[in-house]
UniProtKB/Swiss-Prot annotation:
Its main location: nucleus. A zinc finger (NR C4-type) spans 117-137, 153-177. Induction: Induced by oxidative stress via FOXO3 activation. The modification N6-acetyllysine is found at K231. The gene is NR2C2. Belongs to the nuclear hormone receptor family. NR2 subfamily. The keyword Nucleotidyltransferase does not apply. Residues 341-583 form the NR LBD domain. This is Nuclear receptor subfamily 2 group C member 2.
Length: 596
């Protein structure tokens, strides 16, 4: 060992001494400091002892160490007079780390404490996304979030996740990742796009503040934000950004075991169900975009377009659950309803486009409005779950309107115009009717929380947030008022019919015919309320005065809050024609055959 010239006289002991019996006191020749040296025999049988005097740069002057040769397997005897040990005390160590510690070699590499992955128990490589985990679970979690993957469990969602079985059930593995503290938002904020054109503009106008969320439509477990430029080149930011995933991370299962988002007890877990409507919407949107751009190179005749639509709706039909649905006959046939009446749509003559409806405008089948929530239910509320639930409600509302014979009698062009004009009102009525099933209050509270954080982070302008907050307040007020009135299924059905057959929208044809249908809906609602709630004289008036509030809600904000997570910059108006072109018999037949 190389060291400066010692300033302390070292006296070695005779190798024949069997035990540490001698204590020598030496004096520093310069300072006069007395140091006690304890000597002992090396148990390795070495003929000569090794006395090592630490350098002044060591742990401290005056430390004397007696150590066995490095090649010896015997224990090392450390003699020291430093402050951390009693002078003259013998400390027996067998590992090099302790020797290095006593020598003051703190910079020498030493064995690290082994940590284990909290998910599978394998050797951890560090803390990733908020939890100590191995490289395998780190990569699995990152892929699941970035690619928006969703999984299903073939068992009871309680599979054992360990080093050897972690790949058997991806659903339970991802679930355990979340339970052990891995954060989805950490994955999203880890990297930023390198494309400058995708960066958020600092001076974004309030009118263009929207969010478009990148989607893996095979299985959208969670939304990943991206900014999509409009046709005019304006980049947009918006309401549901990455922070939405932070502030909306509210457990869907309370501590007492009750579920916030109610689901149908008969519904079974189905793999990929969460993204089914997203696939349909995108198929229709892409087809619409191709047709609007005049790109017919890949879409030859109308037959191919029809087949694209049919395939899309086949997928849609399998996601819906209407056990009581039946194929609707054509308008020329009579329909026997459960109430015993029949509906006949009769045209007086070709020159007079007024149609008379014999029997009730709505049958008992139109009263049933059963929304099936996406399955499997995620443990934490996320943007795609909200958008998927809203999309199912929208499609269910349009299918409900499509099944009314009087509505079909108006013709395809009139149908499209009516639904485009009132889809937001129909959707809002559906929200009020299904508020408990969707846990609407939880969804709105999460959105409000996110908007409050957006104010602090200057992600949205004050005017834009004010508009959205007013819209949410109106929506919540409307739903609360409908719940307070305790509107039943018949009343909701007739209110939707009144909204659907509104003749005052601009650009409508056959306004006289539409007005007659609306009057009939109002009369039938009045008869029902008088018979069912005869003791409540003002009930009908209190119900009808709620309808004007629907016109005060912006369809653009509704679309932005509930649908951009799935369809991006594709408008609802562009999707409506394809939904209404589906043949009712084929549509209902697919639904009946695919009931969950």
């Amino acid at each position: 060992m190389t060291s400066p010239s010692p300033r302390i006289q070292i006296i070695s002991t005779d190798s024949a001494v069997a035990s540490p019996q001698r204590i020598q006191i030496v004096t520093d020749q310069q300072t006069g400091q007395k140091i006690q040296i304890v000597t002992a025999v090396d148990a390795s049988g070495s003929p000569k002892q090794q006395f090592i005097l630490t350098s002044p740069d060591g742990a401290g002057t005056g430390k004397v160490i007696l150590a066995s040769p490095e090649t010896s397997s015997a224990k090392q005897l450390i003699f020291t007079t430093s402050d951390n040990l009693v002078p003259g005390r013998i400390q027996i160590v067998t590992d090099s780390a302790s020797v290095e510690r006593l020598l003051g070699k703190t910079d020498v590499q030493r064995p690290q404490v082994v940590e284990y992955c909290v998910v599978c128990g394998d050797k951890a490589s560090g803390r990733h996304y908020g939890a100590v985990s191995c490289e395998g679970c780190k990569g699995f979690f990152k892929r699941s979030v970035r690619k928006n993957l969703t999984y299903s469990c073939r068992s009871n969602q309680d599979c054992i996740i360990n080093k050897h079985h972690r790949n058997r059930c991806q659903f339970c593995r991802l679930k355990k990742c979340l339970e052990m503290g891995m954060k989805m938002e950490s994955v999203q904020s880890e990297r930023k796009p390198f494309d400058v054109q995708r960066e958020k503009p600092s001076n974004c106008a309030a009118s263009t503040e929207k969010i478009y969320i990148r989607k893996d439509l095979r299985s959208p477990l969670i939304a990943t934000p991206t900014f999509v430029a409009d046709k005019d080149g304006a980049r947009q930011t918006g309401l549901l950004d990455p922070g939405m995933l932070v502030n909306i991370q509210q457990p869907l299962i309370r501590e007492d075991g009750t579920v916030l988002l109610a689901t149908d007890s008969k519904a079974e877990t189905s793999q990929g169900a969460l993204g089914t409507l997203a696939n349909v919407v995108t198929s229709l949107a892409n087809l619409s975009e191709s047709l609007n751009n005049g790109d017919t190179s890949e879409i030859q005749p109308e037959d191919q377009s029809a087949s694209e639509i049919t395939r899309a709706f086949d997928t849609l039909a399998k996601a819906l659950n209407t056990t009581d649905s039946s194929s609707s006959p054509s308008l020329a046939d009579g329909i026997d309803t459960s109430g015993g009446g029949s509906i006949h749509v009769i045209s007086r003559d070709q020159s007079t486009p007024i149609i008379e409806v014999e029997g009730p405008l709505l049958s008992d089948t139109h009263v049933t409005f059963k929304l099936t929530m996406p399955s499997p239910m995620p443990e934490y509320l996320n943007v795609h779950y909200i958008c998927e639930s809203a999309s199912r409600l929208l499609f269910l509302s349009m299918h409900w309107a499509r099944s009314i014979p009087a509505f079909q009698a108006l013709g395809q062009d009139c149908n499209t115009s009516l639904v485009r004009a009132c889809w937001n009102e129909l959707f809002t009525l559906g929200l009020a009717q299904c508020a408990q099933v969707m846990s609407l209050s939880t969804i709105l509270a999460a959105i409000v929380n996110h908007l409050q954080n957006s104010i602090q982070e200057d992600k949205l302008s004050g005017d834009r947030i004010k508009q959205v907050m007013e819209h949410i307040w109106k929506l919540q007020e409307f739903c609360n008022s409908m719940a307070k009135l305790d509107i039943d299924g018949y009343e909701y059905a007739y209110l939707k019919a009144i909204v659907l057959f509104s003749p005052d929208h601009p650009g409508l044809t056959s306004t006289s015919q539409i007005e007659k249908f609306q009057e009939k809906a109002q009369m039938e609602l009045q008869d029902y309320v008088q018979k069912t709630y005869s003791e409540d004289t003002y009930r009908l008036a209190r119900i009808l005065v709620r309808l004007p509030a629907l016109r005060l809600m912006s369809s653009n904000i509704t679309e932005e809050l509930f649908f951009t997570g799935l369809i991006g910059n594709v408008s609802i108006d562009s999707i409506i024609p394809y939904i209404l072109k589906m043949e009712t018999a084929e549509y209902n037949g697919q639904i009946t055959g695919a009931s969950l």
